[in-house]
């Protein structure tokens, strides 16, 4: 076979693998987030109670806002 055919085959296979990997990773992350949702206010309240703090609604909102802001930065 000619060299250009091998190069074309390698490029096509590489693109197919990249597309398959992307969609596979996307599906995996969707399932992971469905099974393990991000932290919510109830979980944060329980965590604060375990640490011995009395969680006020203001403090909960403040911590949730800080966590969301940190998540956006990354």
Curated annotation (Swiss-Prot):
It is found in: Cell membrane. Keywords: Cell membrane, Membrane, Transmembrane, Transmembrane helix. GO terms for cellular component: plasma membrane. It holds the Pfam family UPF0154. The chain crosses the membrane at residues 4-24. It is a single-pass membrane protein. Its main location: membrane. Belongs to the UPF0154 family. This is UPF0154 protein LVIS_1358. It comes from Levilactobacillus brevis (strain ATCC 367 / BCRC 12310 / CIP 105137 / JCM 1170 / LMG 11437 / NCIMB 947 / NCTC 947) (Lactobacillus brevis).
